[in-house]
Design a protein with these regions (language model features):
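The feature encodes the CheY-like receiver
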Residues: 58
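Conserved sequence signature across two-component system core domains
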Residues: 8-9, 33, 51
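Two-component/phosphorelay signaling modules centered on CheY-like receiver
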Residues: 12-31
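Acidic catalytic/metal-coordinating carboxylates
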Residues: 35-38, 61-64
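Short amphipathic alpha-helix used as the core "switch/output" element in two-component signaling
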Residues: 63-74
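Alpha4 helix (beta4-alpha4-beta5 surface) of REC/receiver domains from two-component response regulators
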Residues: 64, 84-102, 106, 110, ...
Length: 117
């Protein structure tokens, strides 16, 4: 199972709660970023297995970040998160190249692991 994670989200409280949830369930959070450009830099520098990526960021949306990260193919697996429902984004999730989508209120290590299998 992929183990290392970078969390990209502009809300410090969500980053802290996501870190606590994932680390309690065996994931290792190796980095965090508060916007898309910092997230791309962190992902390239830290080379995590998984990126937990908020759809709504201050400088660019998560779909653009995902496309940028997927340019080289291969890892990391990108999982989009949002406080909104997946249906609100239409086909953008599928078009982004992300491994999947998890509503923020459903985030858990098991949910993430199931999506990565």
């Amino acid at each position: 199972m992929p183990n290392t994670v970078v969390i990209i989200d502009d809300h410090p409280s969500f980053r802290a709660s996501a870190r606590a949830i994932l680390e309690a369930e065996g994931f290792e959070v190796v980095g965090e970023a508060a916007d898309g450009s910092s997230g791309i830099a962190a992902a390239r520098m830290l080379a995590p297995d998984v990126i937990l990526l908020d759809v709504q960021l201050p400088d660019m949306d998560g779909f653009a970040v995902c496309r940028e990260l997927n340019l080289n193919g291969g890892p990391p697996a990108v999982v989009l998160v949002s406080s909104r429902d997946a249906a609100d984004y239409g086909g953008l999730i599928e078009q982004s190249g992300a491994r999947g989508f998890i509503p923020k209120d459903e985030l858990g290590g098991t949910t993430l692991a199931d999506l990565l299998e």
